[in-house]
Amino acid sequence: MLSLVLMLLAVITAASAMYLTVQNRSEEIALRRAIGSSRWLICRSFILEGLIVGITAGSLGGIIGNLTTLCVSWIQTWPPVLPPELWLVGLFLGAATGILSAIYPAWVASRKDPAIAIRG
């Protein structure tokens, strides 16, 4: 249960950060829309950005988790237990978190009116 709450917190935090990115890049988004980029292309670029951030975070989390497990096992003189599928779980959860957190900001970015956004 705690892990679900932490995942929800991670999605909300990442979505807030992505939303702020969309707000800061509103002129760029408006310019892309004005020169003919489709709403789907704008949406896709932000979802891809979220996916890349999520996979990077999942990879770093896996590396830090494995190093921590190895250090604690070495200090306690326990045999380390590191199932290889945990890397895949970390990558999948990171990717899912990145995509989920990018959906709403991507939708907001794709709905911006270019004329209003360029004016400021």
What are these regions (language model features)?
Residues 107-120:
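Short cytosolic juxtamembrane segments of multi-pass membrane proteins
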Residues 6-9, 19, 27-73, 77, ...:
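Transmembrane alpha-helical interface segments in multi-pass membrane proteins
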Residues 13-16:
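Amphipathic alpha-helical repeat scaffolds
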Residues 1-8, 82, 86:
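Loop-to-helix entry region at the N-terminal start of transmembrane alpha-helices
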